[in-house]
Amino acid sequence: MASDYSFDIVSEVNLPEVKNAVNQALKEISQRYDFKGSNVEIELNEKEKEIRITADDEYRLKRAVDVLEAKLVKRQVSLKFLDYGKIEPALGGTVKQTIKLKSGIPREKAKEIIDTIKQTKLKVQTQILDDKLRVSGKKKDDLQAVIKLLKEKEFGLVLQFTNYR
């Protein structure tokens, strides 16, 4: 039996689900009456982890964002992963907006999570590994208590627990 148990805390967006949501949003926009005759584009750049939306005017852009958000929620992708850029004028009298997909746990948030875990006085160790955290301890019960605590507290991130050992 292992002497130490551990798990990782990550915050990663599910890119295939985002891609599906973008495709569904494009399909709905092409069929909706209020978008008839307008030019609305939604592009997912998986490498840069961003979504670019281009529309004829600001109103249609906001409606396209609403449709995309609805499709993301339906595909169980949290809107906390989205970081909205400013609406900017684009070529040909159109407007565009870039939405970045946040991935990973920033250092400040990681330190905040570690402080929260330390305040519980549970016998667990927490390490920062790049953009994730590893929590290890001798008892599974302590690790389960940490997971329960982190699920109850709001950090402004979507936390996922993986790599149980």
UniProtKB/Swiss-Prot annotation:
It holds the Pfam family DUF520. One of its GO terms (cellular component) is cytosol. Keywords: Nucleotide-binding. It comes from the Bacteria. CDD domains: YajQ_like (cd11740). One of its GO terms (molecular function) is nucleotide binding. Nucleotide-binding protein. NCBIfam families: PRK05412.1. Belongs to the YajQ family. This is Nucleotide-binding protein CHY_1197.
